[in-house]
Amino acid sequence: MERYESLFAQLKERKEGAFVPFVTLGDPGIEQSLKIIDTLIEAGADALELGIPFSDPLADGPTIQNATLRAFAAGVTPAQCFEMLALIRQKHPTIPIGLLMYANLVFNKGIDEFYAQCEKVGVDSVLVADVPIEESAPFRQAALRHNVAPIFICPPNADDDLLRQIASYGRGYTYLLSRAGVTGAENRAALPLNHLVAKLKEYNAAPPLQGFGISTPDQVKAAIDAGAAGAISGSAIVKIIEQHINEPEKMLAALKVFVQPMKVATRS
Protein backbone atom coordinates (compact mmCIF):
# COMPACT_ATOMS: atom_id res chain seq x y z
CA MET A 1 0.00 0.00 0.00
CA GLU A 2 2.80 2.43 0.88
CA ARG A 3 4.12 2.13 -2.66
CA TYR A 4 1.09 4.06 -3.92
CA GLU A 5 1.56 6.77 -1.30
CA SER A 6 5.21 7.28 -2.15
CA LEU A 7 4.46 7.18 -5.91
CA PHE A 8 1.77 9.87 -5.66
CA ALA A 9 4.00 12.01 -3.42
CA GLN A 10 6.89 11.79 -5.91
CA LEU A 11 4.63 12.56 -8.87
CA LYS A 12 3.15 15.55 -7.08
CA GLU A 13 6.63 16.89 -6.48
CA ARG A 14 7.47 16.48 -10.17
CA LYS A 15 4.08 17.95 -11.20
CA GLU A 16 3.16 14.76 -13.05
CA GLY A 17 0.22 12.42 -13.16
CA ALA A 18 0.48 8.63 -13.17
CA PHE A 19 0.29 6.55 -16.32
CA VAL A 20 -0.84 3.02 -15.49
CA PRO A 21 -1.07 0.29 -18.15
CA PHE A 22 -3.24 -2.82 -17.79
CA VAL A 23 -2.34 -6.23 -19.22
CA THR A 24 -3.44 -9.80 -18.54
CA LEU A 25 -0.76 -11.93 -16.86
CA GLY A 26 0.43 -14.73 -19.13
CA ASP A 27 -0.81 -13.16 -22.39
CA PRO A 28 0.36 -14.43 -24.89
CA GLY A 29 2.59 -16.75 -22.82
CA ILE A 30 4.56 -16.42 -19.59
CA GLU A 31 7.94 -15.49 -21.03
CA GLN A 32 6.63 -12.85 -23.44
CA SER A 33 4.24 -11.52 -20.79
CA LEU A 34 7.20 -10.83 -18.46
CA LYS A 35 9.02 -9.06 -21.32
CA ILE A 36 5.89 -6.99 -22.01
CA ILE A 37 5.74 -5.87 -18.38
CA ASP A 38 9.45 -4.94 -18.36
CA THR A 39 8.90 -2.96 -21.57
CA LEU A 40 5.91 -1.07 -20.13
CA ILE A 41 7.97 -0.08 -17.09
CA GLU A 42 11.01 0.94 -19.16
CA ALA A 43 8.74 3.06 -21.40
CA GLY A 44 7.46 5.04 -18.42
CA ALA A 45 4.66 3.17 -16.62
CA ASP A 46 4.31 4.53 -13.06
CA ALA A 47 2.33 1.55 -11.74
CA LEU A 48 0.92 -1.71 -13.12
CA GLU A 49 -2.63 -3.00 -13.27
CA LEU A 50 -2.62 -6.75 -13.99
CA GLY A 51 -5.37 -9.25 -14.68
CA ILE A 52 -5.40 -12.93 -13.74
CA PRO A 53 -7.01 -14.99 -16.53
CA PHE A 54 -10.55 -15.99 -15.57
CA SER A 55 -13.04 -18.10 -17.51
CA ASP A 56 -15.99 -15.70 -17.25
CA PRO A 57 -14.78 -12.09 -17.40
CA LEU A 58 -18.01 -10.08 -17.07
CA ALA A 59 -16.69 -6.53 -17.08
CA ASP A 60 -14.24 -7.05 -19.92
CA GLY A 61 -14.77 -6.11 -23.53
CA PRO A 62 -13.78 -8.47 -26.37
CA THR A 63 -10.15 -7.26 -26.48
CA ILE A 64 -9.40 -8.26 -22.89
CA GLN A 65 -11.50 -11.43 -23.19
CA ASN A 66 -9.23 -12.43 -26.09
CA ALA A 67 -6.17 -11.78 -23.92
CA THR A 68 -7.63 -14.15 -21.34
CA LEU A 69 -8.22 -16.79 -24.03
CA ARG A 70 -4.62 -16.45 -25.25
CA ALA A 71 -3.32 -16.89 -21.69
CA PHE A 72 -5.55 -19.96 -21.25
CA ALA A 73 -4.31 -21.36 -24.57
CA ALA A 74 -0.77 -21.01 -23.22
CA GLY A 75 -1.86 -23.05 -20.18
CA VAL A 76 -1.44 -20.20 -17.68
CA THR A 77 -2.83 -20.91 -14.19
CA PRO A 78 -3.47 -18.58 -11.22
CA ALA A 79 -0.56 -20.29 -9.40
CA GLN A 80 1.77 -19.37 -12.27
CA CYS A 81 0.42 -15.81 -12.19
CA PHE A 82 1.54 -15.52 -8.58
CA GLU A 83 4.98 -16.85 -9.53
CA MET A 84 5.12 -14.16 -12.22
CA LEU A 85 4.09 -11.50 -9.71
CA ALA A 86 6.92 -12.55 -7.39
CA LEU A 87 9.41 -12.24 -10.29
CA ILE A 88 8.07 -8.82 -11.31
CA ARG A 89 8.31 -7.61 -7.73
CA GLN A 90 11.90 -8.87 -7.36
CA LYS A 91 12.95 -7.06 -10.51
CA HIS A 92 10.98 -3.85 -9.80
CA PRO A 93 10.99 -3.30 -6.03
CA THR A 94 9.27 0.11 -5.95
CA ILE A 95 6.56 0.07 -8.64
CA PRO A 96 2.99 -0.30 -7.31
CA ILE A 97 1.36 -3.51 -8.58
CA GLY A 98 -2.43 -3.80 -8.66
CA LEU A 99 -4.57 -6.81 -9.52
CA LEU A 100 -7.88 -6.44 -11.32
CA MET A 101 -9.91 -9.60 -10.98
CA TYR A 102 -13.09 -11.48 -10.16
CA ALA A 103 -14.48 -12.81 -6.88
CA ASN A 104 -14.43 -16.47 -7.95
CA LEU A 105 -10.64 -16.43 -8.14
CA VAL A 106 -10.52 -15.05 -4.61
CA PHE A 107 -13.06 -17.61 -3.32
CA ASN A 108 -11.19 -20.50 -4.97
CA LYS A 109 -8.25 -19.86 -2.69
CA GLY A 110 -10.22 -18.74 0.35
CA ILE A 111 -10.44 -14.98 0.89
CA ASP A 112 -7.83 -14.71 3.62
CA GLU A 113 -5.40 -17.08 1.90
CA PHE A 114 -5.72 -15.11 -1.34
CA TYR A 115 -4.75 -11.80 0.26
CA ALA A 116 -2.00 -13.49 2.28
CA GLN A 117 -0.55 -14.72 -1.00
CA CYS A 118 -0.83 -11.22 -2.50
CA GLU A 119 1.13 -9.83 0.43
CA LYS A 120 3.75 -12.56 0.11
CA VAL A 121 4.52 -11.83 -3.57
CA GLY A 122 4.41 -8.06 -3.15
CA VAL A 123 1.03 -7.07 -4.63
CA ASP A 124 -0.05 -3.59 -3.47
CA SER A 125 -3.74 -3.51 -4.37
CA VAL A 126 -6.66 -5.65 -5.47
CA LEU A 127 -9.81 -4.54 -7.28
CA VAL A 128 -12.48 -7.27 -7.32
CA ALA A 129 -14.60 -6.18 -10.29
CA ASP A 130 -17.78 -8.09 -9.52
CA VAL A 131 -18.13 -7.33 -5.79
CA PRO A 132 -20.29 -4.26 -5.05
CA ILE A 133 -19.14 -2.05 -2.20
CA GLU A 134 -22.00 -3.15 0.08
CA GLU A 135 -20.78 -6.76 -0.15
CA SER A 136 -17.10 -5.90 0.12
CA ALA A 137 -16.54 -6.24 3.89
CA PRO A 138 -14.88 -9.71 3.92
CA PHE A 139 -12.64 -8.73 0.99
CA ARG A 140 -11.53 -5.35 2.28
CA GLN A 141 -11.01 -6.65 5.82
CA ALA A 142 -8.78 -9.49 4.58
CA ALA A 143 -6.97 -7.03 2.30
CA LEU A 144 -6.17 -4.65 5.15
CA ARG A 145 -5.06 -7.54 7.39
CA HIS A 146 -2.45 -8.34 4.75
CA ASN A 147 -1.36 -4.78 3.87
CA VAL A 148 -3.11 -4.89 0.51
CA ALA A 149 -5.10 -1.83 -0.60
CA PRO A 150 -8.76 -2.57 -1.42
CA ILE A 151 -9.65 -0.62 -4.58
CA PHE A 152 -13.16 0.55 -5.41
CA ILE A 153 -14.71 1.72 -8.66
CA CYS A 154 -16.31 5.15 -8.64
CA PRO A 155 -18.92 5.23 -11.44
CA PRO A 156 -19.76 8.54 -13.16
CA ASN A 157 -23.24 8.56 -11.58
CA ALA A 158 -22.06 7.89 -8.00
CA ASP A 159 -24.31 9.49 -5.38
CA ASP A 160 -23.08 11.12 -2.21
CA ASP A 161 -23.47 7.96 -0.09
CA LEU A 162 -21.38 5.92 -2.49
CA LEU A 163 -18.68 8.61 -2.70
CA ARG A 164 -18.45 8.62 1.11
CA GLN A 165 -18.21 4.80 1.22
CA ILE A 166 -15.51 4.73 -1.45
CA ALA A 167 -13.56 7.37 0.45
CA SER A 168 -13.94 5.52 3.70
CA TYR A 169 -13.18 1.95 2.52
CA GLY A 170 -10.76 2.45 -0.38
CA ARG A 171 -6.98 2.68 -0.07
CA GLY A 172 -4.17 3.08 -2.60
CA TYR A 173 -6.13 4.76 -5.37
CA THR A 174 -9.76 5.17 -6.50
CA TYR A 175 -10.70 3.69 -9.89
CA LEU A 176 -12.62 6.48 -11.57
CA LEU A 177 -14.77 5.13 -14.38
CA SER A 178 -14.89 7.36 -17.45
CA ARG A 179 -18.04 7.43 -19.52
CA ALA A 180 -16.30 5.87 -22.50
CA GLY A 181 -18.64 4.63 -25.18
CA VAL A 182 -21.83 5.23 -23.21
CA THR A 183 -24.26 7.35 -25.20
CA GLY A 184 -27.72 8.80 -24.90
CA ALA A 185 -29.87 8.58 -21.82
CA GLU A 186 -27.42 6.76 -19.57
CA ASN A 187 -25.04 9.64 -20.10
CA ARG A 188 -27.28 12.29 -18.66
CA ALA A 189 -27.16 11.27 -15.03
CA ALA A 190 -23.38 11.33 -15.04
CA LEU A 191 -21.70 14.21 -13.28
CA PRO A 192 -18.78 15.98 -14.91
CA LEU A 193 -15.56 14.31 -13.88
CA ASN A 194 -14.13 17.34 -12.08
CA HIS A 195 -17.19 17.43 -9.81
CA LEU A 196 -16.65 13.79 -8.80
CA VAL A 197 -12.95 14.42 -8.29
CA ALA A 198 -13.69 17.44 -6.07
CA LYS A 199 -16.14 15.40 -3.96
CA LEU A 200 -13.68 12.51 -3.57
CA LYS A 201 -11.02 14.99 -2.48
CA GLU A 202 -13.42 16.59 0.00
CA TYR A 203 -14.07 13.16 1.57
CA ASN A 204 -10.33 12.33 1.62
CA ALA A 205 -10.60 9.43 -0.81
CA ALA A 206 -7.49 7.74 -2.21
CA PRO A 207 -6.23 9.57 -5.36
CA PRO A 208 -8.46 8.92 -8.39
CA LEU A 209 -7.05 7.24 -11.50
CA GLN A 210 -9.34 7.46 -14.51
CA GLY A 211 -9.81 4.28 -16.49
CA PHE A 212 -11.95 2.83 -19.28
CA GLY A 213 -11.53 3.89 -22.88
CA ILE A 214 -8.21 5.71 -22.39
CA SER A 215 -6.23 5.24 -25.59
CA THR A 216 -4.62 8.60 -26.54
CA PRO A 217 -2.25 11.08 -24.88
CA ASP A 218 -4.99 13.74 -25.16
CA GLN A 219 -7.32 11.60 -23.05
CA VAL A 220 -4.58 11.19 -20.43
CA LYS A 221 -4.08 14.95 -20.36
CA ALA A 222 -7.84 15.57 -20.12
CA ALA A 223 -8.14 13.17 -17.15
CA ILE A 224 -5.35 14.96 -15.31
CA ASP A 225 -6.74 18.40 -16.22
CA ALA A 226 -10.05 17.31 -14.67
CA GLY A 227 -8.18 16.63 -11.42
CA ALA A 228 -7.49 12.89 -11.68
CA ALA A 229 -4.11 11.77 -10.30
CA GLY A 230 -3.52 9.81 -13.49
CA ALA A 231 -4.99 7.45 -16.07
CA ILE A 232 -5.24 3.70 -16.63
CA SER A 233 -5.12 2.29 -20.17
CA GLY A 234 -5.98 -1.34 -20.86
CA SER A 235 -7.69 -2.30 -24.11
CA ALA A 236 -5.45 -0.09 -26.26
CA ILE A 237 -2.37 -1.86 -24.90
CA VAL A 238 -3.85 -5.34 -25.14
CA LYS A 239 -4.80 -4.57 -28.76
CA ILE A 240 -1.13 -3.93 -29.58
CA ILE A 241 -0.29 -7.36 -28.13
CA GLU A 242 -3.02 -8.90 -30.31
CA GLN A 243 -1.86 -7.12 -33.47
CA HIS A 244 1.72 -8.37 -33.13
CA ILE A 245 0.99 -11.80 -31.75
CA ASN A 246 3.43 -13.51 -34.14
CA GLU A 247 6.16 -10.87 -33.95
CA PRO A 248 7.33 -10.71 -30.34
CA GLU A 249 10.09 -8.15 -30.91
CA LYS A 250 7.86 -5.86 -32.98
CA MET A 251 5.23 -6.16 -30.25
CA LEU A 252 7.63 -4.85 -27.59
CA ALA A 253 8.76 -2.01 -29.87
CA ALA A 254 5.14 -1.02 -30.59
CA LEU A 255 4.27 -1.06 -26.87
CA LYS A 256 7.17 1.27 -26.17
CA VAL A 257 6.05 3.66 -28.92
CA PHE A 258 2.54 3.66 -27.44
CA VAL A 259 3.49 4.15 -23.77
CA GLN A 260 6.13 6.89 -24.11
CA PRO A 261 3.76 9.66 -25.34
CA MET A 262 1.08 8.51 -22.84
CA LYS A 263 3.59 9.13 -20.04
CA VAL A 264 4.70 12.46 -21.56
CA ALA A 265 1.03 13.57 -21.48
CA THR A 266 1.03 13.26 -17.66
CA ARG A 267 3.55 16.09 -17.31
CA SER A 268 1.94 19.48 -16.83
UniProtKB/Swiss-Prot annotation:
Domain of life, per lineage: Bacteria
Catalytic activity: (1S,2R)-1-C-(indol-3-yl)glycerol 3-phosphate + L-serine = D-glyceraldehyde 3-phosphate + L-tryptophan + H2O
EC assignment: 4.2.1.20
Transmembrane spans: none
Classification via InterPro entries: Aldolase_TIM, RibuloseP-bd_barrel, Trp_synthase_alpha_AS, Trp_synthase_suA
Disulfide bonds: none
Keyword Lyase: yes
Pathway: Amino-acid biosynthesis; L-tryptophan biosynthesis; L-tryptophan from chorismate: step 5/5
Gene Ontology molecular function: tryptophan synthase activity
Keyword Flavoprotein: no
SUPFAM superfamilies in the cross-refs: Ribulose-phoshate binding barrel
Pfam family, one: Trp_syntA
Active site residues according to the UniProt entry: 49 (proton acceptor), 60 (proton acceptor)
Gene Ontology cellular-component terms listed: cytosol
Keyword terms, alphabetized: Amino-acid biosynthesis, Aromatic amino acid biosynthesis, Lyase, Tryptophan biosynthesis
Function: The alpha subunit is responsible for the aldol cleavage of indoleglycerol phosphate to indole and glyceraldehyde 3-phosphate.
Family stated for the protein in its record: Belongs to the TrpA family.
Assembly information from the UniProt record: Tetramer of two alpha and two beta chains.
Protein name: Tryptophan synthase alpha chain
Organism of this sequence: Shigella sonnei (strain Ss046)
Upper lineage: Bacteria, Pseudomonadati, Pseudomonadota, Gammaproteobacteria, Enterobacterales
